[in-house]
Design a protein with these regions (language model features):
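Conserved P-loop
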Residues: 2-79
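Conserved RecA-like P-loop NTPase ATPase core
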Residues: 13, 86, 130
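Hydrophobic "anchor" residues on beta-strands that sit immediately upstream
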Residues: 84-85, 114
Length: 139
């Protein structure tokens, strides 16, 4: 199952983490990977998840170093044994650090898992794979 929370409204990450907490409470294992965020968010200290931490000091304009981290994160995700995989802000690395084809391949690799994805951008071909899509909008 693939769930997507997208848009420019607040609450995408909170919703994804809430889903992860419910899954953890039901005995599932959860992996969290946060893209384009540093690893200083306060919730990371208390979440009972497997967390693939982003670089501590994310540069304003990430480049080759960040690309290497993204590549290692994708490998970690593909090899994860977790039941639930949260890809926070993943939509925003598609077409910059991950090609659309590679992102679709990733979803195919995870077809036996529940995947929760957040980000700002709407990507039609990617969204076609989703079971649930929630558009969060500032009003």
């Amino acid at each position: 199952m693939i769930q997507i929370y997208f848009g420019y409204g607040k609450g995408k990450t909170t919703s994804a983490l809430g889903q992860g907490m419910r899954a953890k409470g039901a005995g599932k294992n959860v992996l969290l990977v946060q893209f384009l965020k540093n690893n200083k968010s306060s919730e990371l200290a208390v979440l009972p998840f497997d967390i693939f931490k982003s670089p501590e000091n994310l540069p304003f304009n990430p480049g080759k170093e960040y690309q290497a981290w993204v590549d290692s994160a994708l490998s970690y995700i593909k090899n994860s044994t977790c039941d639930i995989i949260i890809l926070d802000e993943f939509l925003d690395v598609i077409d910059t650090f991950v090609s659309l084809n590679d992102s679709l391949d990733l979803l195919n690799c995870l077809k036996d898992k529940e995947v929760i994805i957040t980000g700002h951008k709407k990507i039609d071909k990617f969204f076609e794979k989703a079971d649930y899509i929630t558009h969060m909008e500032k009003v």
